[in-house]
Structures are given as structure tokens and as C-alpha cells.
């Protein structure tokens, strides 16, 4: 079942409660969802979807996935995302601005926290996204991924994105193209700029790279290359492990 909550709604999910289904905030404003209960479908998919909405606050709940699409002013605090199925991304931000993820925990079977431009019917770039005080555990793909989608016929920009005070517990990705605890891989004519990774602790992981900053063209998901990567700050990042694959920082090779 799907529950749609209109503007001005406050929802409390009590500790110990389990909601089987989806909660949608679609085209709404001033919505608050909080509590200590769980929200997830009976199977795969997002427990909560925030789409084309403004001034949404979500606190404390446990979900399967919680994507944010074409929104302004969304704040997630102390939210936990746990998924086990393919393409089980945790907290993806699509075409949105002024988004804060604070104190979240993600253990996911795909990207834990990702920031994209146009995709899945959402239009535009992403701007002013802050992820802080978070714990990320990727069973496949990336703990952090930026820029992989955009409008190949447009000029999308993903900019002013900060990841600060983050613990990365694991990465276990066999495919080189999808490795990187810290990944910036713009495609589809997207420009990524003004990115900060600060005070990040990376534990020993099973399979992957520390860093993958690469202008990419992945025909599986994109139809063109990205426009570029500009102004990236990596500060106070530590790694407590060994055996990682070689990190990659690369532009696009036109000969490929």
C-alpha cells in the first residue's frame, strides 16, 4: 500500500511499529515524519519517497530506502536505511537543493549516499547538499557517489556538496568501474564542482578503491560523457586497512 501525505502533515511512527508499504510526499510542503518505527514495502523498494516537495523533515525512523527527487529544503536526521536486494540504494538525492543528511546510518546493497542531476523523471542539477555525522556501509557499489546521472541534452551541474565527519565501514564491489569509497563520476554532460570530503574515517574494506574521481562514459547508464570535475577538497581522510585497489583520478580518454 502507498500512503500520500499532503502539505502541513505531521506523521509519528511509534517505536516498535512496522509500516508495510510506501510513504510518499509528492508535491507537498511543510511535512514532518518522525518516530522510531520502521517503514518498508513488503519486498523491495523505497519505504519513504520525497518528490517535488519543499520543507520536509524526517527524523529517527528506519527505512529500506529514502530517495529525494527534485526537492528544496529537505532534512533527514538520525534516519537508518537498510537494504539487501539489488539496486538497493540508501539515500539518493536527485535534482535537489538545500538538503541535509545528519546522523544517518546506511547499510545498503548499492550506493549508500549519492547526489545526482536529472534522472528518473527529475530535472535539473543539485546544489547545496550536506551529509554529516554519518555511518556508511556499502555491501556493493559506493559508500559515496556523486554525479553519475544528468541530462545529456542539457547543462546540469552538481555543486556545493559536502561530506563531513563520516565513518565508512565497508565496500565490497567486484567491478572496477563501480569502485571508490569516495566516487565522483560525472556522465551525461554533467559538471561536478565545489565538492568537499572532510574528516572521513575509512575502515578496512573487502574489495574496492579509496578514491575514484573520473570523467566517465558508461553506456549502461549514460549516453554521453560528463563535462568535468572542478574544485574538490579532500581533507583529513584516514584509512585503517590494506589491500585496497589502486585509486583513480582521471579525465576522459577520447581514444576509447
Located regions from the model:
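Extracellular/periplasmic carbohydrate-active domains that bind, remodel
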Residues: 1-256
Amino acid at each position: 500500500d502507498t500512503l500520500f501525505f499532503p502539505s502541513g502533515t505531521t506523521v509519528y511512527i511509534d517505536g516498535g511499529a512496522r509500516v508495510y508499504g510506501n510513504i510518499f510526499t509528492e508535491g507537498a510542503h511543510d511535512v514532518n515524519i518522525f518516530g522510531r518505527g520502521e517503514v518498508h514495502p513488503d519486498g523491495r523498494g523505497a519505504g519513504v519517497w520525497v518528490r517535488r516537495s519543499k520543507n520536509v523533515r524526517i527524523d529517527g525512523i528506519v527505512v529500506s530506502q529514502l530517495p529525494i527527487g527534485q526537492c528544496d529544503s529537505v532534512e533527514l536526521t538520525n534516519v537508518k536505511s537498510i537494504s539487501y536486494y539489488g539496486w538497493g540504494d540508501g539515500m539518493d538525492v536527485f535534482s535537489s537543493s538545500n538538503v541535509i543528511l545528519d546522523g544517518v546510518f546506511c547499510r545498503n546493497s548499492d550506493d549508500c549516499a549519492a547526489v545526482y542531476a536529472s534522472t528518473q523523471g527529475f530535472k535539473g542539477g543539485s546544489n547545496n547538499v550536506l551529509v554529516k555525522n554519518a555511518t556508511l556501509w556499502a555491501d556493493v557499489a559506493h559508500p559515496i557517489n556523486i554525479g553519475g546521472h544528468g541530462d545529456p541534452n542539457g547543462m546540469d551541474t552538481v555543486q556545493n556538496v559536502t561530506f563531513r565527519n563520516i565513518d565508512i565501514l565497508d565496500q565490497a564491489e567486484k567491478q572496477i568501474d563501480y569502485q571508490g569509497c569516495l566516487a565522483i563520476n560525472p556522465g551525461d554532460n554533467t559538471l561536478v564542482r565545489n565538492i568537499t570530503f572532510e574528516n572521513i574515517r575509512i575502515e578496512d574494506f573487502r574489495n574496492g578503491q579509496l578514491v575514484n574521481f573520473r570523467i566517465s562514459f558508461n553506456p549502461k547508464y549514460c549516453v554521453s560523457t560528463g563535462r568535468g570535475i572542478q574544485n574538490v577538497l579532500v581533507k583529513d581522510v584516514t584509512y585503517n586497512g590494506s589491500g585496497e585497489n589502486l585509486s583513480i583520478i582521471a579525465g576522459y580518454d577520447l581514444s576509447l
